[in-house]
A protein has these predicted regions:
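Catalytic core of non-heme Fe(II) oxygenases with the double-stranded beta-helix
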Residues: 93-142
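Non-heme Fe(II)/2-oxoglutarate
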Residues: 1-88
Length: 142
């Protein structure tokens, strides 16, 4: 089952990843085993915002990323290529996927997932009840 929303000339697709019970526990273990050597971007409220790990260290991340690519094509008509490493010659030094780890009560600020991307996604691996709320805004609005 999925929900499709129109927003600012684009589309937002909400979908539950099938069989998440089969891969989320493995991905959480892989993340926690490797988080100490993650590359970090910047801090928000005292915590590291984006944690970048090599896909070889979090191999189960391929499952939701491939699912997002397939949903983009099937539900949105967007053909895309999955990148697990920065493009050669790119000024971007981090892989194009990352993890955010927040304790209860912590949150992130306004940011853009779609800079130079035709498809972007968010997967919640574990969160408290009534958390994980996404807020969207139009260009020029805050």
């Amino acid at each position: 089952m999925h929900k499709l929303f129109s927003w600012g000339g684009g589309k937002i697709l909400e979908v539950e990843t099938p069989n998440w019970e089969d891969w989320v526990p493995d991905l959480l273990v892989q993340f926690h085993q490797n988080v100490d050597h993650a590359q970090k971007s910047h801090k928000i409220g005292g915590r590291w915002e984006n944690l970048y790990l090599d896909v070889a260290d979090v191999g189960s991340a391929r499952i939701p990323i491939r699912f997002a690519r397939d949903c983009g094509k099937e539900k949105l008509g967007i053909s895309s290529v999955i990148l697990f490493d920065p493009l050669p010659g790119s000024k971007e030094k981090y892989p194009p996927f990352w993890f955010n780890f927040a304790e209860p009560g912590e949150s992130t600020g306004l940011h853009d997932h779609a800079d130079h991307a035709i498809l972007s996604g968010v997967v919640y691996l574990s969160c408290e009840e009534k958390s994980g709320n996404l807020h969207f805004h139009m260009d020029g609005e805050v």
